[in-house]
Amino acid sequence: MDKKSKLINLLKEVGCIRFGEFILASGKKSNYYIDIKKATTNPEILKLVGEIIAEQIKDEDVKVAGVELGSVPIATAVSIIAQKPLLIVRKKPKDYGTKNKIEGELKEGDKVVIVEDVTTTGGSVLKAVKEIRENGGIVDKVFVVVDRLEGAKENLQKENVELIPLVTVKELQSTQ
């Protein structure tokens, strides 16, 4: 079994997709919810996700960024497996100390790959792209564990960023 099929099976096994009435981070209503925390707190899934992304960036001179809180475990796994420096993008700057919005060393011209847990419209990850770019980083790629196929890919393309989903919601909903 290839790694993608294994990931799909594991996501289903731990109950990452739930049905009912839900309000998403984007404000949209949905009849299903991707409970990705069931994956990002599972060591087997986290390692597998880290390996899949690390394989795709191993030959690139990049830093790996995760947006607090959901994608930080993923970014950490990728960083360790790929041996790439880690950045953490805060949603709001700290109100004490350095007041940084980006943790880790980001220098002008650094190439950064962002990892995300779930995308719907891409709004959250677009804020991270903007923040990294405003601080001198170059972002043209975002990896996401699950894409809900509701506009994130298109919205990121408008900003010259490629969205690379490990799994789409269609694949997760299919009954293999």
Curated annotation (Swiss-Prot):
Binding site for 5-phospho-alpha-D-ribose 1-diphosphate: 90-91, 94, 116-124
Pathway: Pyrimidine metabolism; UMP biosynthesis via de novo pathway; UMP from orotate: step 1/2
Top enzyme class: transferase
InterPro entries: OPRT, Or_phspho_trans_dom, PRibTrfase_dom, PRTase-like
EC number, UniProt record: 2.4.2.10
Gene Ontology biological process terms, A to Z: 'de novo' UMP biosynthetic process; pyrimidine nucleobase biosynthetic process; UMP biosynthetic process
Annotated function: Catalyzes the transfer of a ribosyl phosphate group from 5-phosphoribose 1-diphosphate to orotate, leading to the formation of orotidine monophosphate (OMP).
Family: Belongs to the purine/pyrimidine phosphoribosyltransferase family. PyrE subfamily.
Alphabetized PANTHER family for the sequence: OROTATE PHOSPHORIBOSYLTRANSFERASE (PTHR19278), URIDINE 5'-MONOPHOSPHATE SYNTHASE (PTHR19278:SF9)
Subunit structure: Homodimer.
Name of the protein: Orotate phosphoribosyltransferase
Lineage: Archaea, Methanobacteriati, Methanobacteriota, Methanomada group, Methanococci
Protein's gene: pyrE
